[in-house]
């Protein structure tokens, strides 16, 4: 069901039920009262939501034996990353948007340091 090898469906369902119960036990605040009272209720509600979120992450890591966060993306070394603006860079509002160019060799301009 979960699509992950090694994870028990029953453990996953148990964790999901527990997390669902935690979120249901913290309904949104009542919209009545003075502005300050409403603000305080919202602030306390958001803090409880943050606590529930952190508890949910701990539940997932305990029940499933792994972190809820995805594995970080492996990036190439910084020496291989370059900015290539030979193509149309667009207007000033869209500069820098797009996929990075990766060159196999470092450009000679960066290596020499001499002015031509």
Curated annotation (Swiss-Prot):
InterPro entries: REV_protein. This is Protein Rev. Residues 23-49 are annotated as: Disordered. Residues 18-26 are annotated as: Homomultimerization. Its main location: host cell. Asymmetrically arginine dimethylated at one site by host PRMT6. Methylation impairs the RNA-binding activity and export of viral RNA from the nucleus to the cytoplasm. Phosphorylated by protein kinase CK2. Presence of, and maybe binding to the N-terminus of the regulatory beta subunit of CK2 is necessary for CK2-mediated Rev's phosphorylation. GO terms for cellular component: host cell cytoplasm; host cell nucleolus. HIV-1 lineages are divided in three main groups, M (for Major), O (for Outlier), and N (for New, or Non-M, Non-O). The vast majority of strains found worldwide belong to the group M. Group O seems to be endemic to and largely confined to Cameroon and neighboring countries in West Central Africa, where these viruses represent a small minority of HIV-1 strains. The group N is represented by a limited number of isolates from Cameroonian persons. The group M is further subdivided in 9 clades or subtypes (A to D, F to H, J and K). GO terms for molecular function: DNA-binding transcription factor activity; RNA binding. One of its GO terms (biological process) is viral process. Residues 36-47 have a biased composition (Basic residues). Keywords: AIDS, Host cytoplasm, Host nucleus, Host-virus interaction, Methylation, mRNA transport, Phosphoprotein, RNA-binding, Transport. The RNA-binding motif binds to the RRE, a 240 bp stem-and-loop structure present in incompletely spliced viral pre-mRNAs. This region also contains the NLS which mediates nuclear localization via KPNB1 binding and, when the N-terminal sequence is present, nucleolar targeting. These overlapping functions prevent Rev bound to RRE from undesirable return to the nucleus. When Rev binds the RRE, the NLS becomes masked while the NES remains accessible. The leucine-rich NES mediates binding to human XPO1. The gene is rev. Homomultimer; when bound to the RRE. Multimeric assembly is essential for activity and may involve XPO1. Binds to human KPNB1, XPO1, TNPO1, RANBP5 and IPO7. Interacts with the viral Integrase. Interacts with human KHDRBS1. Interacts with human NAP1; this interaction decreases Rev multimerization and stimulates its activity. Interacts with human DEAD-box helicases DDX3 and DDX24; these interactions may serve for viral RNA export to the cytoplasm and packaging, respectively. The keyword Chloroplast does not apply. Escorts unspliced or incompletely spliced viral pre-mRNAs (late transcripts) out of the nucleus of infected cells. These pre-mRNAs carry a recognition sequence called Rev responsive element (RRE) located in the env gene, that is not present in fully spliced viral mRNAs (early transcripts). This function is essential since most viral proteins are translated from unspliced or partially spliced pre-mRNAs which cannot exit the nucleus by the pathway used by fully processed cellular mRNAs. Rev itself is translated from a fully spliced mRNA that readily exits the nucleus. Belongs to the HIV-1 REV protein family. The keyword RNA-binding applies. A motif (Nuclear export signal and binding to XPO1) lies at residues 73-84.
């Amino acid at each position: 069901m979960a699509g992950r090898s090694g994870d028990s469906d029953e453990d996953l369902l148990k964790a999901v039920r527990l997390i669902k119960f935690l979120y249901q036990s913290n309904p949104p605040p009542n919209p009545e009262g003075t502005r300050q009272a409403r603000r305080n209720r919202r602030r306390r509600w958001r803090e409880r939501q943050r606590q529930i979120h952190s508890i949910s992450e701990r539940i997932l890591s305990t029940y499933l034996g792994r972190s809820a966060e995805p594995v970080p993306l492996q990036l190439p070394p910084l020496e291989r990353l370059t900015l290539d603006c030979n193509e149309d860079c667009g207007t000033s509002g869209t500069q820098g948007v797009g996929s990075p160019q990766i060159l196999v060799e470092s450009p000679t301009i960066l290596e020499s340091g001499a002015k031509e």
